[in-house]
Amino acid sequence: MKAEDIKKITVIGAGDMGHGIAEVALLAGYRVAMQDIEQRFVERGLGRIKESLDKLVEKQKVTDENRKAMLGNIETFLDIGEAVKDADFAIEAVPEIMDLKKKVFEQLDAAAPKHAILASNTSNMSVTEIALTTKRPDQVVGMHFFNPAVMMKLVEVIKGEKTSEETMQTTYDLALKMNKVPVRVEKDSIGFVYNRVNAPTQIYLSLLVERGMVTPEEIDARMRKIGMPMGPYELMDYVGLDVAYYGGQYFAERISRDYEPSDWLKKKIDAGELGKKTGKGIFDWSKGRPEIDLSKSKEDFDPAVLIAIQANEATKLLEEGVVTSAEEIDKAMASGGGSGIGTFQMARGIGFEKLAGICEDLAREFGVKVFEPTETLRKGNI
């Protein structure tokens, strides 16, 4: 099957990611089915789509006629079988719980047409493991959108061990038709590209707070002052502290115990303070986006530390064959974050030797093996 053959897309899950992906499909001209387990979830997701389309009409990005046509192109369901029975492409967007994803894919495989491609929007988890629950592992692929799906350009297209080249190419071409920037992930590796490169910075940011070395506002103010649209702690809140927590647990199980979530983050989770989605997390979101006091900027904090950690992890992706080139990593990082600049592009401006030295110092100071510089970073021939 080619991308041109796709007429109807089913999205499983109507939450933040699910309804966003459904809207992306509508904007690209597809018929869409959106499913969730309770009517209230479906109605809330559909309501969010309507609100978003209304805003696009106000901004004159779509016409009112187009808005009505798109709303006429979406159906909602509670039953997975009904939602996917005539789909050409299905995208799962349920919470990051492996057992839940496996259950969903068993149901999709049983009910979807034989030609249909089954994609997971997982941000971290093994596509290969998910695919093993189906009788069509060659037609199972990772298709990782970023939040908010309508605005963010990056889509990671992840190859499981048995994913066919036809499935990869069709999914890549579908992302292009959705006006996204797809990046091929050639090896099913935990965290893929964007989240894998950023994951070690979560260790560092957590350690700074855990040890009382900084406050989140001091770092965010510093990063905002140098031009970042959002500081790293505010971004954690925006995505959801639960996502960071469970992602950390998964990385700890699959890659290194260094990723084990810190006590301060666990306390936030236990208190139900998950960030924007609950109105409170690291910051207070009850009145909208938190105000960051730029006068509290920690001026002696060197942003090169974060770049060093990211560049070091990015070299591991090259060494492991997760992607084919440094350019693909830079495309992912530039499109997924909002800075518009790739990790290696920034690293070259600072110097690989300096960054390797920073990583050595961090590994020694914090006792974190993940921070140890790779041979690729030391040599700098990237």
What spans do the regions from the language model cover?
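N-terminal glycine-rich phosphate-binding loop for ADP-containing cofactors
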Residues: M1-I382
